[in-house]
Regions:
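Charged, amphipathic alpha-helical segments
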Residues: 3-8, 65-68, 125-129
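Short helix-to-loop capping/linker segments positioned immediately adjacent to catalytic or ligand/cofactor-binding
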Residues: 21-25, 89, 126-134
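Short beta-strand segments
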Residues: 17-65, 70-72, 80-87, 95-100
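Extreme N-terminal tail/first-helix region
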Residues: 1-20
């Protein structure tokens, strides 16, 4: 399937989760890490999608001093990544999750401020904690733009898949 917006089931699954495993590669080889993300669907208050603006986008934070932060920075302006998002502790019959590929880019200026608002809406405790808020002021915000997504939903039949490509 190829359309500008992923099917509702894929968007719902991305909205239902808050943590993704982000896979990338650097000079030492492949690696993966877990990051919390906020989903931008293009319908948020104050957000106006422009022509060709990718929907959805996964917004996350990470320091550029981490291994994955260094790898993403080194591959700018569009670091290729793969990711998964699923809830822990599921059984086979009800397993749901999203697999994806895309590119990451660092957000600056107005884009960073908008990402911060969406992230704080998704994780209010971050904005309420002076310690976390201070850390966020000095941490890079990133946007993951999916180019391919696959929903796995065993509740609709073992191995049920729904795919989308940009």
């Amino acid at each position: 399937m190829s359309d500008s917006t992923p099917p509702p089931g894929i968007l719902r699954a991305l909205a239902d989760h808050t943590t993704m495993t982000l896979a990338y590669t650097d000079g030492d080889g492949p690696q993966a890490c877990a990051v919390l993300y906020a989903l931008r669907t293009g319908t948020e208050d104050g957000y106006e999608a422009g022509p060709g603006d990718p929907v959805p986008a996964l917004l996350f934070v990470t320091s550029e001093s981490t291994r994955h932060g260094r790898a993403l920075s080194a591959a700018q302006p569009a670091a290729p990544v793969a990711f998964t998002a699923q809830r822990d502790g599921q059984d086979w019959s009800g397993l749901t999750g999203v697999q994806g590929r895309g590119v990451c880019r660092r957000l600056d200026g107005g884009e960073r401020r908008r990402a911060w608002r969406m992230y704080a809406d998704r994780f209010p405790y971050v904005a309420l904690s002076p310690k976390l808020r201070g850390a966020m002021d000095h941490t890079a915000f990133w946007e993951l733009r999916p180019t391919w997504l696959r929903l796995i939903d065993n509740s609709r039949g073992f191995g049920h898949k729904e795919e989308w490509g940009a």
